[in-house]
Amino acid sequence: QQLGGQQLEGQQLDINFVESVDLGCRRLTERFNLSSDHPSAKDIDGAHKMAAQMMSEAIVRAQQQCAAPELMVGVGGTATSLIAIRDLLDPYDPAKVHLNHISLDEVSQIEGLLASKTLKEREDITGLQAKRAPVMLAGTILLAELMKNSGFKHLVVSESDLLFGLVITAAAVHQGKQSPVIWQPILRPLN
């Protein structure tokens, strides 16, 4: 299961199920007023319930199609920011984030921290970019529910995102090499 993308070097990956859940940080933030100062327990609970329902439905479909995943890799702003917040990274250091692990308990602790702060106070949290403060609580809720519903107690965080993986795949195919994943992009000139 993944929030973002996944790329493992040196291994052939057989991608036999892909699903995008139509729920992101911004939508959850807006629906449950999570960028407000001290969001209500009702709104936080509602966000958890909505995320859990949508994640669990996708996970059931995935389980019907393929074997259980062995590793959860998180990429992008939420996952990398969680490491930066936990480790008080100021300034941000990608080398200290890449391939670092975070537990579900730590994600839940950071969620509590974010929920207890005003938006201005969230902007001042060490390790969190101010521009991410309005959506970080929602991202943390989404990631926590993905971890809970897929049975993962830990997450590996990668600085290499989905775009990086797509570039590697397209470059390999363009060079006539085997794709690092079992998926062959169709490369054609842009007109």
Regions found by a protein language model. Name each.
Residues 3-191:
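Helical "lid/coupling" subdomains associated with nucleotide-phosphate turnover
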